């Protein structure tokens, strides 16, 4: 008997809901939200678009252009949230400070936030931003799942070695609560594992398919 992950159908129906420059503009704080975070150029928008089978999240050759909290509805009570990209050098310092202020406000205040998907470029993992997010997740008790993106840029062996190395570093520094996987948007690598995490956080059960 095959088992169908219900999050797949919801992701395929994802629609843009709204953009918020600050927490006060976010949707009502109820239901289930999963946020996608990552340094600029870590492949966050590409991952979101691949998971939803759509071009919902804006991709740009200029990293750091995502300046707002962007909300995408899966159904009446479940949402994905594209957080501002962080760390692009050409972004003016006042704008960086604005992003950081409202990113911290969102992460610290949303009762409906069930988990954070953190994107790391598999070739450059564990940046200062990544460690800051891991510190926050541990302190707040927030579930976190890491996508080591752009896995297609490495050989299978090199990707696996990086996965094991980052896993070990996270366990030593932050414990066992954070999960991690390889992911490639162009190759659609790691989709099912990511869908299982989303379904678990959004309290959706797998359904048997005859």
Curated annotation (Swiss-Prot):
Residue sites binding GTP per the record: 38-45, 64-68, 82-85, 149-152, 182-185
Residue pairs linked by disulfide bridges in the UniProt entry: none
Cofactor dependence: Mg(2+)
Residues noted as binding Mg(2+) in the record, renumbered to the chain: 45, 66
Every EngB-type G domain range: 30-204
UniProt keyword annotations, A-Z: Cell cycle, Cell division, GTP-binding, Magnesium, Metal-binding, Nucleotide-binding, Septation
A GO BP annotation: division septum assembly
A GO CC term assigned to this protein in UniProt: cytosol
CDD domains, per the entry: YihA_EngB
Molecular-function GO terms, alphabetical: GTP binding; metal ion binding
Similarity comment: Belongs to the TRAFAC class TrmE-Era-EngA-EngB-Septin-like GTPase superfamily. EngB GTPase family.
Function of the protein: Necessary for normal cell division and for the maintenance of normal septation.
Protein name: Probable GTP-binding protein EngB
Annotated source species: Pseudomonas entomophila (strain L48)
């Amino acid at each position: 008997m095959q088992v169908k992950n219900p999050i797949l159908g919801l992701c395929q129906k994802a629609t843009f809901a709204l953009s918020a420059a600050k927490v006060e503009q976010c949707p009502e704080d109820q239901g289930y939200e999963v946020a996608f975070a990552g340094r600029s150029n870590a492949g966050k928008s590409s991952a979101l678009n691949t998971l939803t089978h759509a071009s919902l999240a804006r991709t740009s050759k200029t990293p750091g252009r995502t300046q707002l909290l962007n909300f995408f509805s899966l159904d009446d009570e479940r949402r994905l949230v594209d957080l501002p990209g962080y760390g692009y050098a050409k972004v003016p310092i006042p704008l960086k400070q604005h992003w950081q202020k409202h990113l911290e406000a969102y992460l610290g205040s949303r009762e409906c936030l069930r988990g954070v998907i953190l994107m790391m470029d598999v070739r450059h993992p564990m940046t200062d931003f990544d460690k800051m997010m891991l510190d926050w997740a541990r302190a707040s008790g927030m579930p976190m799942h890491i996508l080591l993106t752009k896995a297609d840029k490495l050989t299978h062996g090199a990707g696996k070695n990086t996965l094991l190395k980052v896993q070990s570093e996270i366990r030593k520094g932050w414990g066992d609560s954070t999960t991690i996987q390889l992911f490639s948007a162009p190759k659609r690598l790691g989709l099912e594992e990511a869908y299982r995490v989303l379904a678990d956080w959004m309290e959706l059960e797998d359904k048997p398919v005859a």
